[in-house]
């Protein structure tokens, strides 16, 4: 792998690609263990990866692993670590004196009226930003004062706020990394973690372009339909109309047949 790729995020954070095991070829090689020798060209590799993605054959994607070095506010890291399939190692406030680095947003956001866990719109309030700076400065001052009094680092850190920056290494396989991106790129995800997800997406798109294209087509920009939703679609569409629409978008052959069967079932598809 080439030298480290670092993308700045927020005011003081970053995402850095530390290491990578495998690429698009590793996905294809893993699949061929199951399917035998077959595809050889890039076009055929892309078709195989697309097939694996749309049929939810996940294990070949787990053969690719990314390791990132991340610097993010603690409140972002706590959301991040909810994705428990990764291997994580974070800087320790027990062993190290934590730096005076805080995330300061350009503006606060207002509480969303319809979603208790979301925000909306900008709240341009200089007094609110001044209050944030005052509290974080006082908290870090108390932290240093406790250390100077001989209080253990593991206890002195209790006074530090959640907008303090932390750093961690995060190692994740591509299948679960795509799941992370599906959730954290979504509009309802908190704005701050979306910026980190976008940085990771930029790296992943460059490193595994065929897998990214399949992910974007079937998961990131795709949707799952419930039984009720399928019934509603069947009431509005005919196989003929749907086939014409799919064909106009360039879908043909087995992919066209598969798409028709997804909505109308094997017995009704043309």
From Swiss-Prot:
InterPro entries: Thymidylate_synthase_ThyX (IPR003669), Thymidylate_synthase_ThyX_sf (IPR036098)
Binding, dUMP: 79-82, 90-94, 157, 184
Positions that bind FAD: 59, 82-84, 90, 173-175, 179
Domain of life, source organism: Bacteria
GO terms for MF: flavin adenine dinucleotide binding; NADPH binding; thymidylate synthase (FAD) activity; thymidylate synthase activity
Keywords linked to the UniProt accession: FAD, Flavoprotein, Methyltransferase, NADP, Nucleotide biosynthesis, Transferase
Cofactor: FAD
Family matches, as CDD domains: ThyX
Signal peptide extent: none
Root EC class: transferase
A GO BP entry: dTMP biosynthetic process
List of catalytic residues: 184
Note accompanying the cofactor annotation: Binds 4 FAD per tetramer. Each FAD binding site is formed by three monomers.
Annotated motif ThyX motif, positions: 82-92
EC number: 2.1.1.148
Keyword Flavoprotein (UniProt): yes
Domain ThyX: 13-218
Pfam families xrefs: Thy1
Reaction equation(s) it catalyzes: dUMP + (6R)-5,10-methylene-5,6,7,8-tetrahydrofolate + NADPH + H(+) = dTMP + (6S)-5,6,7,8-tetrahydrofolate + NADP(+)
Pathway entry: Pyrimidine metabolism; dTTP biosynthesis
Function of the protein: Catalyzes the reductive methylation of 2'-deoxyuridine-5'-monophosphate (dUMP) to 2'-deoxythymidine-5'-monophosphate (dTMP) while utilizing 5,10-methylenetetrahydrofolate (mTHF) as the methyl donor, and NADPH and FADH(2) as the reductant.
Family: Belongs to the thymidylate synthase ThyX family.
Subunit structure, as described in the record: Homotetramer.
Name under which the protein is recorded: Flavin-dependent thymidylate synthase
Organism: Thermus thermophilus (strain ATCC 27634 / DSM 579 / HB8)
């Amino acid at each position: 792998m080439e030298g480290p790729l670092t993308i700045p995020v927020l005011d003081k954070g970053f995402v850095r690609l530390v290491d990578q095991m495998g690429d698009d070829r590793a996905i294809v090689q893993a699949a061929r263990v199951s399917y035998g020798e077959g595809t050889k060209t890039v076009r055929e590799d892309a078709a195989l990866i697309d097939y694996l993605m749309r049929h939810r054959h996940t294990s070949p994607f787990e053969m690719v692993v990314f390791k990132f070095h991340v610097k993010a506010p603690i409140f972002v890291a706590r959301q991040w670590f909810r994705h428990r399939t990764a291997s994580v190692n974070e800087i320790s406030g027990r062993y190290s004196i934590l730096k005076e680095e805080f995330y300061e947003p350009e503006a606060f956001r207002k509480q969303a009226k319809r979603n208790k866990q979301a925000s909306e719109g900008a709240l341009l309030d200089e007094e609110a930003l001044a209050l944030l700076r005052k509290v974080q400065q006082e908290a870090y001052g108390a932290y240093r004062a406790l250390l100077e009094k001989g209080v253990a680092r593991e206890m002195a850190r209790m006074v530090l706020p959640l907008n303090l920056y932390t750093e961690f290494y995060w190692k994740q396989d591509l299948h679960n990394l795509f799941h992370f991106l599906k959730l954290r790129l979504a509009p309802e995800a908190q704005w701050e973690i979306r910026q980190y997800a976008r940085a990771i997406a930029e790296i992943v798109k460059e490193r595994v372009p065929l897998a990214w294209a399949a992910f974007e087509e079937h998961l990131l920009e795709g949707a799952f339909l419930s039984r009720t939703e399928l019934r509603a679609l069947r009431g509005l569409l005919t196989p003929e109309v749907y086939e014409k629409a799919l064909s106009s978008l360039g879908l043909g052959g087995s992919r066209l047949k598969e798409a028709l069967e997804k909505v109308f079932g094997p017995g009704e598809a043309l």
